[in-house]
Amino acid sequence: MKLLALCATGLSLMLSFTSCTNNKHLISDAAERNAVQQDFETRRSKLSHGDLFQVFEQPMSDEQREALTFLYAYMPLGDITDYSGEYYLENIDYSLKAREEMPWGKTIPEREFRHFVLPVRVNNENLDDSRKVFYEELKDRVKGLSLHDAVLEVNHWCHEKVIYTPSDARTSSPLASVKTAYGRCGEESTFTVAALRSVGIPARQVYTPRWAHTDDNHAWVEAWVDGQWYFLGACEPEPVLNLGWFNAPASRGMLMHTKVFGKYQGPEEVMVQTPLYTEINIIGNYAETAKATIKVVDANQQPVPDAASNSKYITTPNSIPLPTKQPMPTVKPS
């Protein structure tokens, strides 16, 4: 009996030690981790009524807790109140599962995984269980493929599920699009981003508010492959990436942008930074770009402080204001 008790104690100690050493950080940089934690605490202090954050009382790994903290720090208020913490925790578990089981999972950098795989929301769709459903259906289909070929294969799968049909209603959820088997470009791209993320592939929805040649807009998808972002037409499979019907008009577009979940610090130009998301300009992925500086002076050729400029481009029959970059706040020296 004493020997058995000793063995059991030793086993208990070994399991405890293993559990501690297996706890990995989702955010390895301590400064970034602390910044997310501070944003989360600020958010939680403003939503102190009720049990909106009760899920954090559950036992979980450091990786799960940091992922949950990241989501709650930056998700829209409605997503906190309308969906349970258990829902987000399950989505996190499937994201981590995909990273562990997909052959490319360990090659995805922390930043791209955090901002372009982990988030559940893509647009203004209702959230659903698509990550779990899509993962179970796609995991064997992309088995043995390279990351590049997996992106192409997922888009083929999306084409089998959804075709283009114009609509004006609120963006349908990924599972709703599968059920109806149709969607406009914003819904097809929401669906395709969700499908790519379900198997651990960083993906984002790209939007141009107006083409240069016509008074219309479009949305499509970019996927991260081996250090580079590639574009694809959602549910419009091609044999290679960076090929779509919109190649030519995109090369003349005045703005291609995407809204990134959280405070994103990537190489792209930041147009707008809010407490919850980062809007970035990615037109450089589609056309050669150059910076132009407009100097506003008075009659004496002196700079006019805080002058507003308004530039437009012409589309028949309209003139459309060009997008502007939000001025970054200046910090006065103390």
Q: Where do the protein language model's features map onto the residues?
A:
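C-terminal motif of bacterial Sec signal peptides marking the signal peptidase cleavage site
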Residues: 17-19
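A short, amphipathic beta-strand motif
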Residues: 290-298
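Short Pro-Gly-centered beta-turn/loop motif in secreted/extracellular proteins
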Residues: 329-334
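Hydrophobic/aromatic-rich core segments of domains that either
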Residues: 137-141, 145, 150-156, 165-175, ...
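Bacterial N-terminal signal peptides that target proteins for export
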Residues: 1-7
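Short, ordered, surface-exposed loop/turn motifs in non-cytosolic proteins
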Residues: 299-325
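Bacterial Sec signal peptide processing site at the extreme N-terminus
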Residues: 21-30
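Secondary-structure boundary elements
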Residues: 28, 37-180, 215-216
